[in-house]
Every structure is written in structure tokens, then in C-alpha cells.
């Protein structure tokens, strides 16, 4: 496994990446040593990889427990966290245990918060199994669960001791999740690392099928993009807020969809909305909007908000965005990361945020919505969200 050191201010941890490297993952976990390994996963990943990992750890490293949580963003809340904590304690968790977060962004968040809270902090190792997790969420110290009014509103910052990633695990990932993950790569290219746009544009595949070498390049470019803005901002309150590009409208759409729109696909919609806001406000050209639409289309995800998501719910959740408080409070604006051009972020009040007029953002959200269709013409949620360029 190749090793890259993730550095954020005084925080450092290794990111080990390989392909078909489960042996290496088991060996490394054994080297870390634990009184008990607490593998946290959702049912699908538990069936694919969790049981095998538990058995091999038990044989080669020490006692191991597999603890599952209900899948889906809609289940990433305080009740699920409470249930996991109770189960971990019943299974023998102590201060020398390691929480192994085996899964995607939802698992990583809830397991990360679990590790931060058990005994006021025990060791955390991420074993990401999705594109979003491998190239985005495990590169952050943010660990959070959702509240009823919005996404990722209850949490803390907590450092993993390692990330152990095997791209072979992406082969069993549903296509919709691969497409969704690529939207975070598009975000990195547009907001932080425009030098990768041309190669990324040529390599994006709407069918969601990527060879291992392409996936490795994408992951390493994402590591570099994150490093540009978090190397001196571990809490992502300064330059690191650029990583929130597309997340204002994106989180509102994702949360309002009750899990039907995956995270990356929602962020893609949020980026298109942000580009339109910049253009309509006179801060960016129409070409920036076109570039957003072109790159999003090449990922294979939709470019419109599905018609069955109530726009009133989206607008309501915009008011509870997790960036509130960085700019002076106003009932007439939303704090947003906006671009002037690729890689050039608009700045105000000493931050990378702009107070975007609420009326303009609401209008853009309305225009981004898919036109209502007769019920008989509707497909299932997954096809609607990810079936085409919109």
C-alpha cells in the first residue's frame, strides 16, 4: 500500500492506498494493537466485507466485533449513535479498543463521532468503501450526525489514527454511488484545483466505470486539493470552507430527499445553483455556468432537482445551513461559497463566504427544479436522480 501523510496544522495521519490489499489492511490493524476491534458498518457492507474482516482480525489480531447501523443518510442521527454506543459497550469496548469505520460517508461520520465520544475518545481507523469516503470525507476531522432540521449539525472534530483504503472495494459499489462520488472530484477541480479540469473532463465516464489507475489518479488529485486548503486550517473555518462549495443548496436537497439523492449528486446540483447565483449577481460569466453543467453531465448525474422533492422543504433547510454564524446574521441572505472563475473564490468579511441574496438563491433553486410530470411517467427515485444528464 502506498502511504501519503495527511497534514492539517499540528495534525498528521497516514493514508494508505492500494488495490486488492485486504491482507495489508488486516496486518496494519494488527500492528496498531487493540483490546477489541469494533467494526462499524451498514448491513450491505457488513455482508460484503465486514464479516470477512471480523473473522480475519479475530484470527490474526485479537477480539473483533461487527456492529451494524441502518443504512442511509436519513438514519444518521442521534438515535442511531446512541444505539451504536450501547451496543459497543455491551460488546466489551474499553479505552484500548479501536473503532474501525468500514463503509461510506454515513458510516464514517457516525463511527467517527462514536469514537470521539466513547470514554471521551478512543482510536479511530477509517476503511472507506465508497468514492466519496475515499477522496473526501476521510480527509476531514469533521464527525457529525444530522438533526431534524438539517444535515451534520451535531458533531465535533476528531482525528483518525489512519486511513486504510482498498480501491478493489469500489468494484461492488452501485453505479449511482460511483457517479455521486465523482461530483466531489468535480467540486475539487472547480473550486480549488482548476489545473486538473481538462484531464478530469476527458476521463469522466457517465457509466461510472473507472479503471484502477484512473481511480488512483483521482484520489491523489483529491488529496492534493484538500491539502491546498486544509494544511493550515484543520477545523475548516478559514480556507477550508472552500470545501463547502456546492454544499449549501446541496445539503438542503440531500436532506429534503430523505436519502433519495446521494451526497455527491446533491452537491452537483448545489454547485450548479452556486454558479448560477454568481452569474445572475454579476460576479461570474455565463461560461462558468456552462462549465459546471458540462462537467456534471459527464459524471452521469442529473442536473435538475427531482420533481418529487418539495422546494418548500429545500428552502426551509437552507435557513439551517451549517455555515451560519461566519458572516453577520441576516434574514435576507445565505452564507455561500461562490466562484468568480475556476479556482477563484469570492471573499467578504475576511472569509471565503459571500452573503448571497436570499431571493436570488430561492429563485435559482426554483428554476433548477425538474418540471412536474404525470405520475405514470415517473421512474423510481434512483433512476430519476442519477439516470441522465437532466
Swiss-Prot record:
Please give the PANTHER family that the UniProt record associates with this protein. 3-DEHYDROQUINATE SYNTHASE
- What exactly does this protein do? Catalyzes the intramolecular carbocycle formation from D-glucose-6-phosphate to 2-deoxy-scyllo-inosose (DOI).
Recorded protein name is 2-deoxy-scyllo-inosose synthase
EC numbers for this chain: 4.2.3.124
Q: Where is the active site?
A: 142, 244
List, alphabetically, the Gene3D superfamilies matched: 3.40.50.1970, Dehydroquinate synthase-like - alpha domain
Listed binding positions for Co(2+) are: 184, 247, 263
Print the organism lineage.
Answer: Bacteria, Bacillati, Actinomycetota, Actinomycetes, Kitasatosporales
What this protein needs as a cofactor is: NAD(+); Co(2+)
Q: List, in alphabetical order, the GO biological process terms annotated in this UniProt record.
A: antibiotic biosynthetic process; aromatic amino acid family biosynthetic process
Provide the temperature dependence entry. Answer: Optimum temperature is 42 degrees Celsius.
Q: Which reaction does it catalyse?
A: D-glucose 6-phosphate = 2-deoxy-L-scyllo-inosose + phosphate
Similarity annotation: Belongs to the sugar phosphate cyclases superfamily. DOI synthase family.
Residue ranges of region Disordered? 371-390
- Which of UniProt's keywords are assigned here? Antibiotic biosynthesis, Cobalt, Lyase, Metal-binding, NAD
- How many cofactor units bind, and how? Binds 1 Co(2+) ion per subunit.
Amino acid at each position: 500500500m502506498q502511504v501519503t501523510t495527511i497534514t492539517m496544522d499540528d495534525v498528521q495521519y497516514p493514508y494508505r492506498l492500494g488495490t486488492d490489499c485486504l491482507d495489508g489492511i488486516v496486518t496494519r490493524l494488527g500492528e496498531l494493537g487493540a483490546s477489541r476491534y469494533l467494526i462499524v458498518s451498514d448491513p450491505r457492507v457488513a455482508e460484503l466485507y465486514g464479516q470477512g474482516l471480523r473473522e480475519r482480525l479475530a484470527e490474526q489480531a485479537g477480539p473483533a466485533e461487527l456492529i451494524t447501523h441502518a443504512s442511509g443518510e436519513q438514519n444518521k442521527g442521534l438515535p442511531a449513535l446512541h444505539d451504536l454506543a450501547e451496543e459497543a459497550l455491551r460488546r466489551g469496548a474499553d479505552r484500548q479498543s479501536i473503532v474501525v469505520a468500514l463503509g461510506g460517508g454515513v458510516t464514517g461520520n457516525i463511527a467517527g463521532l462514536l469514537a470521539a465520544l466513547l470514554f471521551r475518545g478512543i482510536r479511530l481507523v477509517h476503511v472507506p468503501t465508497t468514492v466519496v469516503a475515499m477522496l473526501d470525507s476521510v480527509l476531514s476531522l469533521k464527525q457529525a450526525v444530522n438533526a431534524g432540521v438539517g444535515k451534520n449539525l451535531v458533531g465535533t472534530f476528531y482525528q483518525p489514527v489512519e486511513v486504510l483504503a482498498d480501491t478493489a472495494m469500489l468494484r461492488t459499489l452501485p453505479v449511482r454511488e460511483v457517479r455521486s462520488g465523482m461530483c466531489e472530484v468535480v467540486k475539487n477541480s472547480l473550486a480549488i484545483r482548476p489545473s486538473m479540469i481538462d484531464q478530469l473532463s476527458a476521463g469522466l465516464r457517465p457509466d461510472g466505470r473507472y479503471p484502477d489507475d484512473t481511480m488512483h489518479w483521482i484520489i491523489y488529485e483529491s488529496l492534493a486539493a484538500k491539502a491546498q486548503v486544509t494544511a493550515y486550517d484543520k477545523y475548516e473555518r478559514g480556507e477550508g470552507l472552500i470545501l463547502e462549495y456546492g454544499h449549501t443548496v446541496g445539503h438542503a436537497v440531500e436532506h429534503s430527499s430523505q436519502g433519495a439523492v446521494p451526497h455527491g449528486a446533491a452537491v452537483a446540483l448545489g454547485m450548479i445553483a452556486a454558479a448560477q447565483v454568481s452569474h445572475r449577481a454579476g460576479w461570474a460569466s455565463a461560461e462558468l455556468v456552462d462549465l459546471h453543467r458540462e462537467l456534471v453531465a459527464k459524471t452521469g448525474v442529473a442536473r435538475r432537482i427531482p420533481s418529487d422533492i418539495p422546494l418548500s422543504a429545500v428552502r426551509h433547510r437552507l435557513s439551517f445551513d451549517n455555515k451560519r454564524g461566519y458572516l453577520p446574521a441576516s434574514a435576507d441572505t445565505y452564507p455561500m461559497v461562490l466562484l468568480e472563475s475556476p479556482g477563484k473564490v469570492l471573499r467578504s468579511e475576511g472569509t471565503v463566504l459571500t452573503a448571497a441574496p436570499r431571493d436570488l438563491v430561492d429563485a435559482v433553486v426554483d428554476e433548477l427544479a425538474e418540471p412536474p410530470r404525470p405520475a405514470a411517467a415517473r421512474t423510481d427515485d434512483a433512476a430519476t436522480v442519477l439516470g441522465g444528464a437532466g
